[in-house]
A protein has these predicted regions:
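A generic "folded-domain core" signal
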Residues: 1-137
Length: 137
């Protein structure tokens, strides 16, 4: 591991995925599905949460993240990526992820397929703190 890395991140793959179309479960081909937190001090990025759903999101759609009884919206989407609209929303999401046990992430593909991905949050706080420490923030 580098002593002074320019980027640090944590990443998790889902423990469970589900896709539905017209209310019916369907099998779909998706590329990597991941939930990220990125630290890039030179760009003033500190714990930016993002999600890649493994498919291009429907234009104008948002991605919803449910942690316990907290709901968060990733309103910024670009291709297969989604993230919170601003620092405040990102910080609120991080607080929920630190307190939670699992996160459910809901999205809609450009073909109209709805997805639900389940991520374990066990170890999230420790991993986030380690990434933060390594990137000197």
């Amino acid at each position: 591991m580098e002593n002074n890395p320019s980027q640090c991140w944590i990443v998790s793959a889902p423990s469970k995925t589900k896709a539905t179309r017209n209310g019916k479960t369907v099998d779909v081909k998706r590329s990597e599905i991941q939930l990220f937190a990125l630290f890039e001090p030179a760009q003033k990025v500190y714990g930016q949460i993002s999600f890649t759903g493994g498919y291009p999101f429907k234009q104008g759609s948002t991605v919803r993240v449910s942690v316990g009884d907290s709901e968060h919206i990733l309103s910024q989407t670009d291709g297969e990526w989604a993230w919170p609209k601003d620092i405040k929303k990102n910080e609120e999401l991080i607080k929920s992820l630190k307190r939670g046990v699992k996160a459910l992430v809901f999205g809609t593909s450009k073909k109209g397929t709805r997805t639900q991905d389940t991520f374990s949050l066990l170890g999230f706080s420790a991993a986030l703190e380690e990434a933060q420490k390594r990137c000197g923030t």
